Amino acid sequence: LVGSEMCIRDSLTGIRPTKIPMKLLEEGKSREEIYRYMKDTYFASDEKIELATDIAERENAILKKIDYDNGYSLYIGIPFCPTTCLYCSFTSYPLVSWKNRVDAYLDALEREIDYTAAKFYHKNLNSIYIGGGTPTTLEPYQLDRLIRKIKCSFDLSDCLEFTVEAGRPDSITREKLEVLRKWGISRISINPQTMQQRTLDLIGRRHSVEQTVESFKIAREPVSYTHLRAHETELH
């Protein structure tokens, strides 16, 4: 199958293929040298080479601005999901069982935010990542409450990226996206994990492929896509 479309398309599967051009950029390689390496080594298509290299250059530009000596990054976890995926090992709980405890969790989270802000007041906050779980399981007013608290508690003048993981398409609504836009969130991540409906059903992802496409459309912003080859039926 060498040289076939299937071989070319499958040659860059796996986690973070942009690490390849990123490493080459760090070594001082030019775009032409990166192109030739990825073409000869991975049989990658021109489209994938260009995309991976473009993203690597953007990442590299951000990384150069990070204050590694006096900076820090903040992770905030929202441990709730619409359902629990079959493969998941993260600390996460079905929202249906914990819905009446979410506001209490946010109360505790706000106290921890106050503590963290006081502890690191003398350092530069470089990036914020709200992950999970699925942060967009929060209601719009809860998302607004959380982000407002973050914005009021930390100095974000040196913050290069503010990410909210919108990992489940079935948790995304226009109202929630409007909250994120209002607060100037610079990056969201919509993760279908797979575009095969049979795999979604097998792993307990209670959304459709069509919902993923619709979520991308209403977001109308560049998003990250994690494709998890979660089942042997996707190997063919």
Residue ranges of each PLM-predicted region?
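Conserved non-cysteine loop/helix-boundary elements of the Radical SAM core domain that shape
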Residues: 92-232
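N-terminal [4Fe-4S]-dependent radical SAM core
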Residues: 26-74
